[in-house]
Each structure stands twice: as C-alpha cells, then as structure tokens.
C-alpha cells in the first residue's frame, strides 16, 4: 500500500537536510504566512500556531497527503527572537544571548488531508552561550550567516563555538526536532 506524499511546508535548507537525513521522502512547498505573535501569546503557542498555519496553508494549494509545518524561535529573558531584521538587530540579539541561558522552541504540525487531522507539538531545548566579546559578535554577523536564523545564530555553523552547553534536542536547535517528528510521522502512518 502506498503511504501517500509528505510535503514539507518550508524552504529552510536546514529542515530539508534534517528530514532527508532520516530517510524520509518528501516534497517541498514553502509557505508564506505572517509571522507575528498575538499579544499575550505564549512562545510555545506562537511557534505551534505558525507551524499549524504553514501546514494548513500549504495543503490548501498543493497536492499531498501529510503536510509538515515548523517554526523555530529563540526566547531570552521573555523576548521572542525570530530572524534579525538587519545586522544591528543581529548584534543586539547576540549581545543579549551572550553568557546566558535561553530556550529554542520549535513548533511543528502535521496535517493529514485525508482524515482532516492535525497534530501540533512544541519542543523546547535550553541553550547556554559562553560570554561573547563584541569583536566575536561583529565578525560572526559580518559573515551574513545569522540573517536567516532565529536568534541570529546557527548552532551547526559558525556559532557552534559560542554554545557552552545544550539540554535537549540538538536538531531542534538546528530547526526541526527530528526524533519527535519522525516518530510522529511513523505513529500516524505516514512512514
């Protein structure tokens, strides 16, 4: 019996690489939804809502059976950090993260078109940065790497040395909690 098509509602190269590394066959159809929190919305609820909206919006405009949406945010001292708007914002974010613990939250959703079913979850990983010097921050921002990353850093790239420790899923910090997503896809019959 053919399982049907899985569609990843994201153009993130990191999410594509992660899902492919688990041997999952999928198509890609990026979603384009507004990414603004609702006043008073909890960070995990925000990330999960965006993931749900991405999965459902993608299902409305493309073929497939299961639609996987995801959104990753960084939360530090109560501030939800998405992608920086410019280099100055990236510097500000990295200064705030310097030497402190923060949370990386990825909300993910799997929409099953055939059953009109929706599974939504949030995975939280705690990350601690070493204290960063302004020169380190400036040099990293100058690479351009932080500009499309929540919290202005990529744990798997040039910012790896900034991370003192993590508690939780490494792949969650990269952009997709792979263990959880693959297990849920298996559980619902997509794999």
Curated annotation (Swiss-Prot):
One of its GO terms (biological process) is nucleotide metabolic process. It comes from Geobacter sulfurreducens (strain ATCC 51573 / DSM 12127 / PCA). Signal peptide: none annotated. The active site is at residue 71. Its cofactor is a divalent metal cation. Its EC number is 3.6.1.9. It is found in: Cytoplasm. SUPFAM superfamilies: ITPase-like. Belongs to the Maf family. YhdE subfamily. CDD domains: Maf. This is dTTP/UTP pyrophosphatase. NCBIfam families: maf (TIGR00172), PRK14368.1 (NF010948). The record marks 14, 72, 156 as: Important for substrate specificity. It catalyses: dTTP + H2O = dTMP + diphosphate + H(+); UTP + H2O = UMP + diphosphate + H(+). It comes from the Bacteria. InterPro entries: ITPase-like_fam, Maf-like. It is an enzyme of class 3 (hydrolase). GO terms for cellular component: cytoplasm. Nucleoside triphosphate pyrophosphatase that hydrolyzes dTTP and UTP. May have a dual role in cell division arrest and in preventing the incorporation of modified nucleotides into cellular nucleic acids.
């Amino acid at each position: 019996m053919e399982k049907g098509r899985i569609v990843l509602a994201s153009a993130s190269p990191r999410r594509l690489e992660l899902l492919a590394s688990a041997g999952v066959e999928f198509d890609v159809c990026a979603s384009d939804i507004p990414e603004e929190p609702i006043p008073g919305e909890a960070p995990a609820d925000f990330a999960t809502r965006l993931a749900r909206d991405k999965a459902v919006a993608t299902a409305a405009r493309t073929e497939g059976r299961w639609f996987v949406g995801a959104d990753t945010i960084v939360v530090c001292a109560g501030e939800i950090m998405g992608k920086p708007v410019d280099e100055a914002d990236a510097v500000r974010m990295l200064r705030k993260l310097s030497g402190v613990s923060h949370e990386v939250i990825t909300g993910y959703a799997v929409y099953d078109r055939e059953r009109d079913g929706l599974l939504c979850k949030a995975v939280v990983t705690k990350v601690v940065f070493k204290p960063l010097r302004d020169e380190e921050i400036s040099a990293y921002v100058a690479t351009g790497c932080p500009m499309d990353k929540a919290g202005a850093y990529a744990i798997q790239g040039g910012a790896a040395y900034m991370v003192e420790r993590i508690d939780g899923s490494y792949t969650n910090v990269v952009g997709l909690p792979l263990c959880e997503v693959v297990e849920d896809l298996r559980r619902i019959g997509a794999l």
